């Protein structure tokens, strides 16, 4: 997703990617995808690796609390594997002042909602919303 956005923007806007995976190996992979698809490289992107919560499928109560509060406030369903980490990261980066004032921020919800029901079944309805609600 990040490589496609960076290549599609062709250096015109900044892309901040928030991976659910742990590790900086994605930097090389994204650069490789951009080069293979566009035939050039761009430096208009950043990989923000502080919000993986331990890696793929990892989570903690802080993330669950954020997801539930986010849903209560905005009525937007996010999951604890992918999009919850993304929105937590964006929200925290805004609070830390890491976006310029009056910036237009576009967050792409890349899916993962199908996991909410299974997550709640496995861990006891920690999320206050399901896919069908």
Q: For each predicted feature, which ranges?
A:
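Glycine-rich phosphate/pyrophosphate-binding loop at beta-loop-alpha junctions
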Residues: 1-53, 108-133
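Active-site-adjacent helical/loop segments in soluble small-molecule enzymes
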Residues: 48-102
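Conserved beta-strand elements of the Class I
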Residues: 104-106
């Amino acid at each position: 997703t990040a490589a496609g956005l960076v290549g599609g923007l062709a250096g015109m806007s900044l892309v901040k990617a928030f991976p659910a995976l742990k590790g900086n190996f994605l930097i090389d992979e994204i650069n490789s995808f951009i080069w293979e698809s566009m035939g050039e490289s761009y430096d208009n992107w950043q990989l923000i690796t502080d919000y993986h919560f331990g890696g793929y499928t990892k989570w903690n109560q802080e993330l669950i609390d954020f997801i539930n509060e986010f849903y209560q406030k905005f009525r937007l369903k996010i999951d604890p594997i992918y999009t919850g980490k993304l929105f937590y990261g964006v929200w925290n980066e805004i609070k830390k002042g890491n976006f310029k004032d009056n910036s237009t921020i576009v967050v792409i919800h890349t899916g993962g909602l199908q996991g909410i029901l299974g997550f709640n079944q496995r861990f006891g309805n920690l999320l206050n919303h399901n896919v069908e609600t």
